[in-house]
Amino acid sequence: MAFVTVNGAEIYYQTYGRKRSGQAPIYLIHGATGTGHSNWNKVAPLLAEDFYVIVPDCRGHGRSTNPNMTYSFKELAADVAGTIRALGFERAHVIGHSNGGNIALVTLVEHPDVIQTCIPQAANAWVSPDLVEKEPPIFDPDFIQRERSLWYEELINLHAPLGENYWRDLVLLTVKEIISEPNYTPADLAGVNRPTLMIQGELDRVNAPYKHGQFIARYIPAAEAWIPKGIAHTVHDEIMTEWLERVRDFIARRGTDASEKLYRYRLERHQDARKGIFDPRLNADGVLIGTVLNEEMQSEVLKVLDVPPVENKLKVLITKETPWALINRPLEDVRRKPSILAERVSQARMGESARVIETNGDWSLVRLEHDGYSGWVHSASLHICTESQVRTFQSQCNVIVSAVLAEAQNDEDVLVQRIPFATLAYRMNEKEAVSFLQLPDGRIWKVRSQDLTPLENRPTTNEDGIKRTLDLIQRFCGVPYLWGGRTPYGFDCSGLAGTFYSFMGVTIPRDADQQHFAGEVVEGTPAPGDLLYFGEKNEDDDSVHISHVAVSLGGDLFLHSNGADWGTSYNSFDLSSRIYRKWLHENYRGARRFR
């Protein structure tokens, strides 16, 4: 058995795995009245596949002595710091559950120098009224002995080395601290500067009612929170596989000082992954791994690092050699995964360009050039070509589809497709009110000239152009709602807004929240064509999540694709109107303008 003397107590500990050069160990802290083994015996051996794992009994628990017969989170946190140092480590990845989560949190605040990363689970930063009310009856020794036979037997068995009736003192000492400490303010938490992941089950009866996990994550700078749905107090037991994945991923992303520096840089410069993935990591052995979008981002990574990596294994998705392509069909779904059953995240229209990052059988992972969105498309929808060919084709486009759907025929006068509104096309020639369009792959389709508008006559974002385009998009009233949709086959809210502006030659970000951030703030009454944004407050931190956008028609009236009507429809801010909707009025977050 292994013991180490720390702050006058003999601390018993077990270890799993092997020490790895340059890598901080994982230090697991058990919960109230438990021991290291009773709390962590399932996950510790699994974590040991990748880490050296230290599992102690806290002072006064199991085999660890309690010479002063005391119990306080600050004393136990001092023991954590002392044990880490006594075992020859500068820092550790400190993970604690329940009261152990509190100890981990106190260690984080009071002894940050021994923290590499910190994962408090089911912890509380302050003593909420429900704890004062609920905990004393639960931790009453007589109640435990009389009503909780399994817990009673466990207490005797786990803490027998400290005396036959020691368990009674332990539960009384424990509950006294639970209803007294910790008491950290937002300002206290704001002073923390170590990587922190807060874990709390959605149904945790101890901590969830007062949202302790969200409170901690809100105020610790750059802290992350994981609140798994349908899970109670012991997340690491209830969903062990997912818990292990989350912990390993967090430590992989933020587990070294260099990786943390890269992570903070990512939050500052590349937080929105929709604009391009930026996920570099530097292992404890100095090897640079992870993924970034392009070579420019790779250069940023190397500049951020103080010391060049021992080896550069960073994956760069788009390089000079990455193939170019043009969308070669009127419409192609862009999906999150290479499956027809996967989420549709957006759509691409014919003639739009993309970089082909990866091909997997019938599917290709692409990044659309016009809005930066990435996803999987059918490989057959792509015309692979050079950048020069892309630029040539797009520069030749001289008409835009102004019909809702322009019927296209082949050279045998057979209807082959319908080309959606706002598609740019290359008209080679025109004869008897029929336009001959050349596709990216060279095929020729015939379309009625009246369904097209020459680019020289395309409306712009002046008052007249906006009015003309508003008249055109109002034809879409009744078109079904379609998640990810950008065409009259089906729109989502931001897809309709983006299509409205793209017809006038303006590219705006794909999603509503991105648009809200990028557009010019409209002061006063929105004008026709301004975009109106909506979103609910996040109850955890009072921030607003923009989730919806509409196109203003002037005054109180607007047009939008929405789930309430499951289609494109009109609504109004006028309380007396039959098309007034309370949610839209209450959650309106302002207008934006693009030019």
Regions found by a protein language model. Give the residues of each.
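Conserved HGGG/HGGXW glycine-rich cap/lid loop of the alpha/beta-hydrolase fold
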Residues: 9-63
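Active-site loop/oxyanion-hole signature of alpha/beta-hydrolase fold enzymes
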Residues: 41, 45-48, 55-95
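Flexible "cap/lid" loop of the alpha/beta hydrolase fold
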Residues: 102-110, 115-151
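Short beta-strand/loop motif that positions the catalytic acidic residue
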Residues: 192, 198-200
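Boundary regions of SH3-family modules and the immediately adjacent low-complexity/disordered segments
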Residues: 293, 299-319, 368-400, 438-471
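Beta-loop motif signature
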Residues: 327-353, 398-427
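Aromatic- and glycine-rich peptidoglycan recognition patches
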Residues: 384, 390-392, 453-455, 459, ...
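...with weaker cross-activation on analogous glycine-rich loops/strands in unrelated enzymes
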Residues: 506-567, 573
